[in-house]
Amino acid sequence: FHRPMKGEMYNRHIRFGTDHGSFHEEMAELLSWRPRVAPEIYDAQTKGQMLYLDADNDQAAATAIEASKHMPVWSRYVLCQDSATHFSIKKKIVNPDCCYIEGLHGMRAPGSVNIADESGSFSLSSKDFWQKYPSAVEAGDLDQDNAEVIFWLWCPQVEAMDFRHYADQGYSQTYYEGFDVVGASAYGIGNTNNFSIELSNNAASDGDALKRFSDS
């Protein structure tokens, strides 16, 4: 899924649904030691509010804008549900030579994500996300003119599916298989996946709204 992105980096938000609320970040987080950003500006940003900073008439706004020029800008996030009891979120800047850093670990993610900018927001979800592990949702190019969201039905971070049998013969008499044929094969496997999308003119979705969307 692709969507145009507009506005300042500090007004671009991402939120993933998690098993205990949500994980929310901005592409340029206005938490700075030098220059010091006014707490009320940073607090409004963390709540998902759009910031309309007037550097010409507000010194606090001018300081925040200057600080934003020296922040790391996060371009890509990946949530991977690699087992029935673990998911991770990692992020990186746009430079391909730089590594990912970890953002969060949890148990079971619902498979929902919300991305917002100054023009509105959109939410996407995948039904039975954690149950169908290893699954992943990746959001990239968040600092560019067009962002993309990819739902991976098989998370590329984990090992490839292995269809080899665990042994070179059957054990129908001594164990549970009931037949001697070695039948490990991908033939005949099928799965239906359901995805939902919601578009909004409003700013970033809060955690409760994203949960309602994911549960619907």
Where are these regions (language model features)?
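Beta-strand/loop-rich accessory regions of lumenal/periplasmic or secreted enzymes
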Residues: F1-S216
